[in-house]
Amino acid sequence: MKKLTTIFIVFTLALLFVGNSTSANNGSVVEQNGQLSIQNGQLVNEHGDPVQLKGMSSHGLQWYGQFVNYDSIKWLRDDWGITVFRAAMYTSSGGYIEDPSVKEKVKEAVEAAIDLGIYVIIDWHILSDNDPNIYKEEAKEFFDEMSALYGDYPNVIYEIANEPNGHNVRWDSHIKPYAEEVIPVIRANDPNNIVIVGTATWSQDVHEAADNQLDDPNVMYAFHFYAGTHGQQLRNQVDYALSRGAAIFVSEWGTSAATGDGGVFLDEAQVWIDFMDERNLSWANWSLTHKDESSAALMPGANPTGGWTAAELSPSGAFVREKIRESASIPPSDPTPPSDPDPGEPDPTPPSDPGEYPAWDPNQIYTNEIVYHNGQLWQAKWWTQNQEPGANQYGPWEPLGDAPPSEPSDPPPPSEPEPDPGEPDPGEPDPGEPDPTPPSDPGEYPAWDPTQIYTNEIVYHNGQLWQAKWWTQNQEPGYPYGPWEPLN
């Protein structure tokens, strides 16, 4: 596409954080901030002022690429207030290595972001191919092409290794040497834009990278977490890395457990959001998809081009939208008029004994209040307006009355695992070697193999049969909250 001329506006009052106004008065976020760089471990704009980007990550473009288009990204900018979008291009699992045409969807996302004046992350999404060196030559070719096409645009951020993982894949031995070959390819075309490098153990071990940093002034280190699995220990690792002067970008996080499903864990997510805000850490939430998992931002049937109603947002999506809007100084509002049946007027019949609680009012904004509606008390789980208690099983209201709710407040897990892996659990300890002792009587079932991919299979390990509950590789049976269910 024809290159755009980036207009840089000099402010007399420095911005402390990236806002997100796209009005004619303020210009786009890229017009406001221009070329990003790192100073003293902090992401800053062209004026040297600290910047905090907030936005969304796609799911795998080979599976859910229909949600990545100009209209959906524009809606995320205008309605949610995002300042960054991450295009997650899986390398394996049906991604770029098997189907190079998926890079066309990356280009579509990048060019939309440039037109819309937001930042964009080009994500080389390694996952089941746990060692980034497996496809190092392909990575060099890909980033040579991307940096040649888009290196003149300050919008672009390169993420060269999503989640290195596996007990042998460490920063010093595998990840840093890989980065030292890939980054120079980018720098030959693009000397200035930010490069994000993944860290060991599914981009959790930022402390290792902080102790042996790359020799590039504009490198950041990826940190990923899932609110239902990860807590204070990982926050301590981030603080250690920051204390060593390492620049951290939370290029992926979820409200769910580390599997991408389970939850949502909104209280824990809020702790993490506060943590990131206090440290001015930029972030992208996983993920823009309608997949049947709790980390998905959209409900099944959501419009791929944006304009999402309240009914089309999942609990995670509604929560993340509001968190981004808060920092973007966008007044709270419903996404669009809901597609659910009109709730009509508030319950005109005074409850027989509602105590101190008022009747639900569709015109009222609620965040944590308790209301009375249809003979029952309800409490808002997050920000809501004009969403009737009980009208949506995945909605913002939790029943408090004596009668049990007709549907669970969280989406039920799928009866069968999805064929695509989603994000595997990065919270497991290293599984070590497979059980070297053959089972005395495993019957027809093979011994667990850490190199094998499992989705629903039964294996024998440590004298016991185990069945995979979802996609897994290199995660040893027997760890709590993991992907394996004991069968005997």
UniProtKB/Swiss-Prot annotation:
UniProt-annotated catalytic positions: E163, E252
Alphabetized GO MF terms: carbohydrate binding; cellulase activity
Keywords: Carbohydrate metabolism, Cellulose degradation, Glycosidase, Hydrolase, Polysaccharide degradation
GO biological process, one term: cellulose catabolic process
Domain of life: Bacteria
Binding locations of substrate: H59, W63, Y64, Y90, H125, Y226, A258, T259, W286, K291, D292, E293
Reactions catalysed according to its record: Endohydrolysis of (1->4)-beta-D-glucosidic linkages in cellulose, lichenin and cereal beta-D-glucans
Entries under CDD domains matching the protein: ChiC_BD
Family: Belongs to the glycosyl hydrolase 5 (cellulase A) family.
Enzyme class: hydrolase
Keyword Hydrolase: yes
SMART domains the record matches: ChtBD3
EC id: 3.2.1.4
Name the UniProt record assigns to this protein: Endoglucanase A
Biased composition annotated in UniProt, kind: Acidic residues: 417-433
Region (Disordered): 326-362, 388-451
Bias-annotated ranges (Pro residues): 332-353, 405-416
GO cellular-component term (any): extracellular region
Provenance organism: Evansella cellulosilytica (strain ATCC 21833 / DSM 2522 / FERM P-1141 / JCM 9156 / N-4)
